[in-house]
Amino acid sequence: MAKKSLIQREKKRQKLEQKYHLIRQSLKKKIRSKVSSLSLSEKTKMREKLQSLPRNSAPTRLHRRCFLTGRPRANYRDFGLSGHVLREMVYECLLPGATRSSW
């Protein structure tokens, strides 16, 4: 089980990412736009605005965690579980349709 503080930190990052998502997206779109007639100084101002946003609001700072244990590694997107928990649940027949492989 992961520390509760780490799980809360990840939830805080998710909230920040949702809050600043549209702002970050619009600034990036304006900077990357080839059609816009922005001068170099205007683009640098937009980059500074982008850099002034909180670091934890960037989507690259997010990390998937198992929703049962909070484990940050070996997560399966389809289930939202880490590999360890997924394996145990399959063995106990708690996931419908999932079976152990045998050949």
UniProtKB/Swiss-Prot annotation:
It comes from the Eukaryota. Transmembrane segments: none annotated. It is found in: Plastid, Chloroplast. The keyword Plastid applies. GO terms for molecular function: rRNA binding; structural constituent of ribosome. GO terms for cellular component: chloroplast; small ribosomal subunit. Pfam families: Ribosomal_S14. Keywords: Chloroplast, Plastid, Ribonucleoprotein, Ribosomal protein, RNA-binding, rRNA-binding. The keyword Transmembrane does not apply. InterPro entries: Ribosomal_uS14 (IPR001209), Ribosomal_uS14_bac/plastid (IPR023036), Ribosomal_uS14_CS (IPR018271). GO terms for biological process: translation. Part of the 30S ribosomal subunit. Belongs to the universal ribosomal protein uS14 family. Binds 16S rRNA, required for the assembly of 30S particles. This is Small ribosomal subunit protein uS14c. It comes from Lolium perenne (Perennial ryegrass). The gene is rps14.
